[in-house]
Regions:
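Gly/Gly-Pro-rich "capping" loops immediately C-terminal to redox-active cysteine motifs
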Residues: 52, 56, 68-99, 116, ...
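Short cysteine clusters
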Residues: 63-66
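Short, internal strand/loop/helix patches
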Residues: 107-115
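N-terminal secretory signal peptides that target proteins for export/translocation
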Residues: 1-2
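C-terminal capping alpha-helices of c-type cytochrome domains
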Residues: 6, 11-14, 23, 89-93, ...
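Proline-centered turn/helix-capping motifs that create local helix->coil transitions or kinks
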Residues: 99-105
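Electrostatic cytochrome c docking/interface patches
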Residues: 28-58
Length: 141
């Protein structure tokens, strides 16, 4: 009888940890808002190291003045943005910064927190925005 109880207990423990792990391992961001802009659907696969390298170059050239990965600067830190927002949202913010700042409620709230300092339009293409997204995905791990 004691052996049977241990088998049942072990089985239930395994089921519990598997179900708990499945929510822990989810990669979808909590917020499912795609933002305002032309990017409607981004299909993510494994991290592409070439895109990461290209995206890092763009980040260092156009973003790092205002955004650090870990600390607040003129704008918010970006290390976990790929975990917190949809890929479409991030790309739309990069390719459609002006409209996002005018229309998106989350960005409007951020502006208030950061002294209403507007993000300049980075003037990058969707292809370039995709590489920046890939870089941000790589640092969010």
């Amino acid at each position: 009888m004691m052996k049977f109880k241990w088998i049942i207990f072990s089985f239930l423990a395994v089921v519990f940890f598997i179900s708990a792990g499945s929510t822990i391992l989810q990669t979808k961001p909590q917020n499912q808002d795609p933002g305002v802009g032309p990017v409607k659907n981004v299909v993510l696969g494994p991290i592409d190291n070439q895109k990461v390298a290209d995206g890092k170059k763009i980040y260092l050239a156009k973003c790092v003045v205002c955004h650090d990965l870990n600390t607040k600067k003129i704008g918010p830190p970006l290390k976990n943005i790929a975990k917190e927002r949809m890929p479409e949202y991030i790309m739309n913010l990069l390719v459609n910064a002006v409209q996002m700042q005018k229309q998106d409620p989350f960005v409007k709230d951020l502006l208030k927190k950061y002294n209403n300092v507007l993000m300049p339009d980075p003037a990058i293409s969707q292809t370039q925005a995709r590489t920046v997204l890939e870089y941000l995905r790589s640092v969010a791990k």
